[in-house]
Amino acid sequence: MDYKDYQYSRDAAWRILIDCHTTELPVRALAICQALGIPVRRTSLIDAPEGRSVALNGRPVILLAEWPSPERRRFTLAHELGHIILGHVGRVGLLNREPSPEDDPLEQAANVFASRLLAPACVLWGCNVQSAAEIAQLCGISQTAAQFRWERLQLLYQRGKFLVSPLERQVYAQFRPYIEAHKR
């Protein structure tokens, strides 16, 4: 994924946090879908994919399996929301949720969207998060997803690259009361 595509996905996640007036972790992905008018339908079929975003009668719908852990469902829901927000619905049939260098670019973009929506770096930085375990606990995501986010956050810590974008500063300001209450 090139930086321009990464930026687009990241910024889309920040815009959703801002537009939906999200102010605390864990981010309530289902409430965001409801606020955006995107129905989420659950399936209990054990052999069903974890999630899929589709268009029914010209409107986006997210299909979400009930069998994964709540943390995994949260990430899958945010991932599928990313496909919708980024305009992928109808363009992709892949169902991969575990990030991989071989991922389709649309899957990579949806993963970036989901991780930035559920675990915004500026909020984690503001809370002085120092481990994947802390990310998993604060954000309500799986240890695997938290580890990927922690690895990226460590790079940002090394570079000192926080609050550079006006959108990121807006997200930080919106979460400020939460950050102050959860600073470690």
Regions found by a protein language model. Give the residues of each.
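Active-site hotspot residues in diverse enzymes, especially metal/ion-binding acidic/histidine motifs
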Residues: 1-184
